[in-house]
Each structure stands twice: as structure tokens, then as C-alpha cells.
Amino acid sequence: MPRLLLLALAAALAAPAHAQWTNRYPAVPIYSHHVYLEGYELPTSAAGPTDPAPSPDGRSVAVAARGWLWLVDLDTRRARRVTSGPAVDARPAWSPDGRRLAFVRDRSDETEIVVLDLDTGAERVVASAPGLELDPAFTTDGRGLLYSAAHDNGIGLRRLDLETGAVEVVSDALGLALAARPHPDGEHVLYLAKRGADEVRLRSLATGAERALHSGRILSQTRPALAPDGRTVALPLPLDDGWELVLMDVDDPVPTVRLTAGAAPPLAPAFSADGQHIYFSQAGADERFRLMRIPAEGGEPERVAVEAWDWGAEVGTVTVRTTIGGAPAPARLALATADGHPLFPDGQAWFDGQNGVVYTVSPGELTVRAPAGGVRVAAVQGLATPAVTAEATVPAGGDVAVALALEPVWDADGWLAADHHFHLNYGGPYALDPADLDGLLAAEALDVATPLVANLHNRYVDDELWGADRTDAFPVREFGQEVRSHFFGHVGLVGIDSLFHPWIWGPGYEVFGDDDRENATATAWARRQGGISTYVHPVGVRDPFAEGAGRSVPVELVADGALGELDALEVVCLWTDDVGTAELWYRLLNLGHAVIPMAGSDVMSNFYRTMAPGTTRLYVAVGEDASYADYLDSLKAGRSIVTTGPFLDVRIGGAGPGGVIEGGRTEWTAELASAGPVDRVEVVVNGAIVETLPGLAEAGRRSLRGAVDLPDGGWVAVRAVGDRATGWPSMAAYPFAHAAPVWIGAVGSTDPAAERQAARDLLRVLDASEARFEAAYRGVEAPRLRDRFSRARRALEGVAE
């Protein structure tokens, strides 16, 4: 049954919420961050040709395009579609006799291996166990398939006998084993092993003996190709500012020969049957994939242009026009055939891993090719418009126009929407420029975007773009930096004039691995430049103060917070739990530290499988005619809300977020608006929920009011919470919105009982953090770090007693 598209868009989902997004596809237990597993290892789909597989007779190349498989005739340059249906097909591999293709079929939450008989068109599912199946390749005798399959320790290699159906385990080693390439001797297999380092390995099928041909770190788009004679490997490898395609000798792999280099990776290289050419797919500056080839001995890459596409069916187009208030409006779109197969635009498309939807963006009008027949369309703008859907019929050889009028449930005048933590490029199949964000920002109704430059282990990504193409007029687009000490915690820096160095340190890195350096040095760096330092994606559990949960908090965070050296906390992020992070934030507020609530989606815009920037965002109240400097001032003053969807306009004692009021009996109001359901609204005083009111059963608005007894010190805020995912426009695990606090008496005031309990709670987390630090730094002189923990402990103990 098709599982794509509109079910997730038209109504709330029935599935219970997870604490945060964890995985769309079956989990691989050893893999801690499925966003990378799904982003790097699962197929990329697009309108243009990907996954080239030259035929054994040298006359054609099988490719994936528009979610189906096609055969490109190399003489006529005509592509003929050979698969159909609602699922998305990718990664074709030829049988040695050229009569069959094996491929990956993606059903939006599961994969399987299918074999297609090209003479009859018959398909046979040959591998469909629970868990991921990827990367089929026929054995040299054509009687079996090698493929990758999930197991308890990761993803291993399997060999399937196509006659008997028997499956043999080739390798179940800890880690990932992908992209098997049978050696022509029939006795070995080349494959990509990911076990800490990423390695291209050659394995004996008889003995299991292996040797590594190449080793690197986070080879995100690397998939090896083996020459027909088994002597040469073609390999895409990352550079600091792009990718290269190299050749290496199987027997002496250390020297390499560069064939080509560029910004975007040369994806899925494959040798022609005669070994004379290497085919690959590559995205251009327009984010359109093209089929390329280069002589195996070197030379200029050439495009293998497809002159005609034979769909095997009548074809037309659908033109979608989106408006708000009668005027053309940018939008996020999802288009599909009547049976649920996604329709791909000519440019970049993405896969929403929360809802299982392929989407793109439109400036207000977009035309997409489609088979004649029924189509379904959904559109939203940002988080403020409920999904509008329509069905239409595409005429053969003609166009059908679909008009969708979007209606925001709230008016954001006087507020600016921002995402302060996402990445332009981060190892995905595209090489994006800053201007490539413009369509996304418009469709997501974002006014401020600060993509962060960051490292991919020992490579610095986008550092060459630092300071480039900044926009001062709204929407503002300005790079920030993510300083990524995996051990101490990641810190995002925005509003800075220069980059902090080093970008990385601490256990796990080859250089600066036992450095006596604090995250607080990066915070001080940002403060000196008038910027903001934020601990990003800080808490992945619902209650970080539960027994044993303290290890979920970044090692240095509590120490920095206790010493007042923490500017901001990323309260909403796709990869962490918003409610759990709020609990940590509450304790810091209760110490009297006016920690700014921040929001960042942490998506990677050059991935195919990623949610959109602004999926988690903040709204900052700036009034009319504000500048970017005004925005930053308001952000620092706490005049904001963070959200995954709902909107809250809060007044407590007449003051908005960031304001100051007196204690005692105080009236409050909240305007709640949401493009989807949200279960409840809660009033929070010094971290305790003191009043709960019903939210919204469906998209709309509600005015709420009440009165609350306030102590003489501390803070009060309002939040909105939902218990399950709601579908578009949301791409988050559950609805959550939180207004920044209104302070009682003065900014930074405290309630003695709440302050005392906060210190006690934070001391338990500090115990866990310090224990982790001492275990990692055993025998290492680190006086600055030890002094930081000591001073933080004294500060907390002085309050807790």
C-alpha cells in the first residue's frame, strides 16, 4: 500500500509522540544519530538522473530519476522508464547477462530489494525483512545477490541465492557494511565499512580476511566503483572545499590519481563494461543532477545529456499557484500522483523525515511534469498556515492549474521569525551557495537565518563562505559558527565578526584531544564581539534530573550555567526533547540567570533527507521598522517565544516576555494560535506548572486569560504543549511553544525555595558531568577545567545549603 504524502498533511497523526525525532526508517541500534544514517546512506532522489549503472553490453546506462528507474540508450540518448508505482526506486544493478536489474525500493519508512526482469517487466521482491536493505549487486555468476541488511550490531553484508532463496551472512561485524562490489574473480568483494573510520575494504568471501584500501573520516558521499578487471577502484573523496574523484590501484592503493574535482560530489561512480569510462551523477549550481562520464585514464568530464524521456505513458504538467490574501505567496509544496508517488521538480527537493513527504519550495508558481491522470497537491507557508490540499487531473500533453489560497492563523506583524542553528552544507549530495537559501527562507516565512559553519570531523565546512553574501535587509542571512567539542558540548555563536579557533577540541579528536580549554572561552569570544553563545541540542531526555539521566547533559553546561557564563540555551531543536530541555532551562532561570531561550532546527540544507529550516524557530517582538541590530537587542532582552508550531502572544500583569512585574495576585492573557492541534496551555512559575487550560482541537485561535498568585521573586511564563505529531505544516515530533519569562521584581530575581532546589538538582548533574570529565582526563593536567568545575560546585553548594 502506498504510504506517501497526504495522510500526514490533511489530519493529525494517530501515532504517539516521541521525545524528539529519532528515525523515520527502522532504527539501527548502534547508530546514535539517524539523521546522518538516513541522510548519508539512504538513496537521494531527484528529477535528474542519479545512481548510474552501465549495462554489460555497453549500450545503455540504468539510472534513477523522478523516483523510478530508466534505461538511457547511449546512441539515441533516449531514456525509457522501466519501473512504475507509488514507491521510490533507486540504486539499480545489472545482472551479468544484462537481462535483470536489482534495485532498492523505498516505501518512505522501509526499504526492500527487488529484481526486475527486463524482458517481461515482472518484479520479484527478494529481500524484505524488518529493517533496512540496501545496495544490491549481482554475484559474478549471476545466480546470487550481495546486499546490505540491518542486524543487531549495525548493517552487514548478505549473499542471497536467487534460486533457493537461501541467505548467507557474509559479514556481521560491528558497524555498517555498504555498497558491495563483487570482484570479477568471484572470490572477493569490495565494500564500504563504517566502523569509527570509514574504510574501503577488500574481503575474501572464503576466509573473511580483509584489508583496507582507503581510510577516512565521515566519507559521507563516498561509494566505490570497481573496474571490470578488478585492478582499479574509483572513489569520490571529500576535500576541504569540495570533492574529487580519484583512482587507486587495488594492490597498491596509497598513491591516487585525481580524475576530477568540484564543489558537488561525483556521486555513485561506475565503470563502463569495457573499463574505458567512469559514469557518475553530479548536481550543478542549479541543484539539478546530470549524468556525467570521464575517461578512466583521465580527461575532461562530459555530460551524457538525455534528449528525450519515454515515460511509457502520456505525460502532462501541473502548475501550482499559491496566494495569501489574493497575492502570490511563496510556499512549501508536496505533489504526488493519485497512488502516492512523489512528483519531483527540476531543481532541489527534500524528504521530510517526520511526515514521510517529498517536498519542494515555490516562489508562488511552480510547474512540475507528471503522468497524465490524478495528482494531489498540498501547500503551506512556514508554520502559520494550515495545510491546503487539492486534487486535479493532468491532461495528456497539457497542463492543469491548481490554485491554493493559504490563510495564516496569526498575524506576525511586529515579530521577526528566526532559525539560529542550521547548516547550509554538511556532507550532502549538493553544494549550495548562500543565495540558494532564499527560496527556502521565503517558503518558510523566516526573517532571520544564521546558518552555522561547522566541522565534519577534521574538515571545516563552509568556512570559505564566512562573511560572504551577507544580507542586511530582511530576510537577513548571516553565517554563524558551531564550535563543536563533542565532549564538552556544542556551542553556537551568532552575531560575531570573526571565527573562533580552534573549532574542535576534547576527547575524540586527534589534535587538542586533551586540551585544557573551556567552552566558556568561546562564549567570552562571542560576548566581546556583541554576539550570543548558545548551548545547542542540549538535552535528549524528558527529565534530565531523573536518576541516571544527568549524563544526557553536555559535560560543561551546568558548570557554565552555575557561573553565569551561559548566554542562551537552545530550548527547541529537532534532535532533542523540548520539554526536557525546558526543565534544565528552568533551573538556570531559578538561579537568577537570565538565560535566553533559543531555537534552531539543526537541519542540513544540502541533504535530500531533511526537514526545513524554521521547523523549530523563535519569534522576536521588535515592533515596526526594526533593523537587524534592533532584532539582536530584542533577542538578548528576552522579548521572544520559541516554537515548533504554535504561536503565543503573552501578557502577564501587562508585561510581555522579557518584562518585569511585581508579585502578588496577577492577571494574565495569552493569544494562542496554531496551524494544527495543540493539547494544552500551561502557566509556569519558577519551573512549576500552576495552571493548565485546554489548547486547540484543530487549527485556529483561542484567547485565554486567568490570574495567578506570584511570589516576590523569580519568573513566570506561559507555554503550549501537544502530545503527538500533527502533520504539516509541522515537521517536529510534537507541538511546543514557550514564551520567554516575565521577571518578578527585577530581571534575575529569585525565589529562595526554588533557587535552593534548582541548585540541588544541578549539583546532581554536575556530579555526573565531573565524573565523566575525570574519567576522560585521567592523568591529564587540566587546571583551568578542574578549576571551573570546582568554582561551579562552590557556587551551587552555597545556594543549596
PLM regions and their residue ranges:
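Bacterial N-terminal signal peptides
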Residues: 5-14
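A short, Gly/Thr-enriched small/hydrophobic beta-strand-prone motif that recurs across taxa
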Residues: 311-325
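C-terminal functional module detector
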Residues: 324-343, 348-351, 356-359, 364-368, ...
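Sequence signature of WD/YWTD-type beta-propeller architectures
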Residues: 20-315
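Sec/Tat signal peptide C-region and signal peptidase I cleavage site
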Residues: 15-19
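Flexible loop/turn segments at secondary-structure boundaries
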Residues: 242-243, 265-266, 286-289, 425-427, ...
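Catalytic cores of extracellular degradative/oxidative enzymes
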Residues: 415-597, 601, 608
